[in-house]
Structures are given as structure tokens and as C-alpha cells.
Amino acid sequence: ARRGESLRAHVIISLEAAASGTSKTIRLRRKVHCGSCSGSGAAAGSRPVTCNTCSGRGQVLRSQGFFSVRSACPTCQGQGEIIENPCKTCQGAGLEQKNEEIEIEIPAGVEEGMILRVTGRGNEGARGVPAGDLQVVIGYERHAFFQRVDDHVGFELPVSYSQAVLGADLEVPTLEGKAVLTVPPGTQSGEILRMRGMGFPSVHSRRSKGDQLVEVTIEVPKKVSDEQEELLRQLAEIEETEVGARRKGFLDRFKEYFG
């Protein structure tokens, strides 16, 4: 006989839990062997009787032309037995619904959408048939800072113009807590800084681990103080005489284009 039905449950975890591994308690309603009849389907004091149609085999042979086809017995529905006096609790099914709590282990590095299979924790089968499996679908909580990119962690870091030009040591969040990231002098907006080994472990190999990929964005203030404005105007005057290579190339092309 085939196994009991498989069940599916959804679990939502944080990115931090996905990186380190965790355990979760799942509450579900599943079919289990009836407590009144111990799964036999027969009322107390009675027993199922052997099906006369299939002689207890649960299958019958039917001739179709030159061939014989084996199929489930129509009298006992493939069980090989007939319940003449069914259990009142389960109406002869041998199963009843029960609320259960099942604790599962979620491995480090588990990916969103991955299905974890818990053997034998689905619906139990009637009359000794093995239970099906529990399929647990993993989902991620929305994170305030991070997003997963393969085994890497994507993170956007806003910095000031002066920090990008002069460089800075900045405290940033990681999956394992706070860490210091060195922003090199002359960092460009959109540049990716890599924090090695600060990503997710591979769910297939704990020895392999991704990185944290920090995309630097230069924040341009909408308002500045009088002192800041004066300093910026002085800087603008200097920039008119000291043009960088990329900007100089653009200005040369601009002049050439417009003659």
C-alpha cells in the first residue's frame, strides 16, 4: 500500500537565522492512528475480516482480451480486509485529526524557497501504512539592511562626499554583528567594497562562505550651512583649475561635439 499523504508547511526566518542555522517549532494538524481502535478501523471487541473477493490480497486480476490486468479490489478498496463493525470515533477510517507541534532543525545557509523534508511527519497511513513526509518551505523576513545574492550579502552604505574623497573607517552592520569597514580614499559612488567571509555559509558545504558586498553611495546634502557653502565654493574654484582625468575627457568631448 502507498504511504500516507505528505503535508506542507511554511516557515519564515530572519537572514541572521539563515546564516547561523536555527530550530523552529511548527504547529500543524495531521492525520494519526485513531486512539480508540489503534488504527484498525474496527470497533472495540471486533476485528476486520478477510475480504472474500480478493482473499485478503487487496488486488484482483481482470482479463482484457489476451491480457490480465491487476487492479485494486473494488470490494475492500485494496485493503484486503472489510470492517463490518466500524469504530465510531473514526468511522472505520483508522485515522483521526490531531493538532501537533513538531520541532525542526534548519541548517546554516538555507536558501529562500528551499524545501526541507522531514521524513514520516506527514499524515499517517491507515492500517499500518507508513506515514508521509512533512515538507517545510523556507521564506525570509524582509531585512532593514541586507539582501541575499547567492551566498553573498548585499548592503548599501551611504557616505558623505568628504568620507569618499578622504577615506574613512566606518562601523557597519553584518550578519554577525557590528564590524569596521575601511572606505579607501577616492572611493567612487556605486563602487563595491568586499568584506570577505562575512556572507552566508553554503548549505552544501560549511567550509565555503560568501562575502558581504557593500555598495557605496555618495550622499549629496539638499541643504548646507553657510560655513559648508563657503568651503564648497572654495573647492569649486580649485576644481576649475585642477580637473580630474575623467572629467577632463568629458569636457574635451563636449567641446569637440559642439564645435
Go through each PLM region and give its residues.
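Charged, often glycine-enriched C-terminal and inter-domain segments
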Residues: 3-23, 66, 81, 85-89, ...
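Cys/His-rich short segments
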Residues: 27-102
